């Protein structure tokens, strides 16, 4: 019988954690080292009235926090026992310098703000004045152009009126001259016709009178001749 082939299974390696030290070694505390007081209410819980660290049941989560607390308490206790000399003059001098520096900075800041504000106001005022001046000039220019246009319009109107008046006067003069010439021509024609008619009438009357006189004289002469012959 043949052996059944099974898939090769890798052997599981045992999971081993690296050994870690329970507490890290710290450098010895000296004067000037910084103490980290993160939570004062928690510190008060761990310290008794006599200044001793109280034993507490610690869980795995709060272990790290308690370690930091105990180290901070120990540091504070050691530092409080170290011989620090409190120099009041130096402290006061430092405080005075800090206060003067702060006041100087505030004064400089205030001065700077006032100067900037003043500059801004002057710039805005200048801009406003320039804008108003520009607007005024444009308005005056428009007004001048308007007046010029009205003047040219009025002059054009007056010239047109003058031209029309001249044309009217010329036309009226022409018509009056024509009328006068026509009337004079008519009157002269009438006078001529009247005079010619009068002269013709006079001539006709004279000729007729002459002819009648001649006829009468002839007839009278004939009658006288006949009378003389009868006698």
Swiss-Prot record:
Query: Per its record, how is this protein called by name?
Result: Small ribosomal subunit protein bS18c
Which residues, if any, are the signal sequence? none
Task: Give the family per the record.
Answer: Belongs to the bacterial ribosomal protein bS18 family.
Asked whether the keyword Oxidoreductase is assigned, the reply is no
Keywords in alphabetical order: Chloroplast, Plastid, Ribonucleoprotein, Ribosomal protein, RNA-binding, rRNA-binding
Q: Region (Disordered) spans which residues?
A: 1-31, 95-231
Q: Which organism is it from?
A: Jasminum nudiflorum (Winter jasmine)
Q: In the UniProt record, which is one GO cellular component term? A: chloroplast
Major localization listed first in the record, in broad terms = plastid
NCBIfam families for this protein: S18 (TIGR00165)
Question: Out of the domains of life, which is the source?
Answer: Eukaryota
Q: Where in the cell is it found?
A: Plastid, Chloroplast
What gene is it encoded by? rps18
Per the record, the GO terms for biological process are: translation
Subunit structure as annotated in this protein's UniProt entry: Part of the 30S ribosomal subunit.
């Amino acid at each position: 019988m043949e052996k059944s082939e099974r898939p090769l299974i890798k052997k599981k390696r045992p999971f081993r954690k690296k050994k870690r030290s329970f507490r890290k070694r710290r450098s010895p505390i000296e004067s000037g080292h910084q103490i980290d007081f993160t939570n004062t209410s928690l510190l008060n819980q761990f310290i008794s009235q006599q200044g001793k660290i109280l034993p507490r049941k610690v869980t795995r989560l709060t272990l790290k926090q308690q370690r930091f607390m105990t180290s901070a308490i120990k540091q504070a206790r050691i530092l409080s026992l170290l011989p620090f000399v409190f120099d009041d003059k130096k402290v006061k001098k430092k405080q005075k310098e800090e206060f003067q520096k702060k006041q100087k900075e505030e004064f400089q800041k205030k001065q700077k703000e006032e100067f900037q504000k003043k500059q801004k106001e002057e710039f805005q005022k200048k801009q406003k004045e320039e804008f108003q001046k520009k607007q005024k000039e444009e308005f005056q220019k428009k007004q001048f152009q308007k007046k010029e246009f009205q003047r040219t319009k009025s002059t054009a109107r007056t010239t047109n009126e003058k031209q029309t008046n001249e044309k009217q006067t010329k036309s009226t003069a022409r018509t009056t001259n024509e009328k006068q010439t026509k009337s004079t021509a008519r009157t002269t024609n009438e006078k001529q016709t009247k005079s010619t008619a009068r002269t013709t009438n006079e001539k006709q009357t004279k000729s007729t009178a002459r002819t009648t006189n001649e006829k009468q004289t002839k007839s009278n002469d004939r009658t006288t001749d006949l009378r003389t012959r009868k006698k």
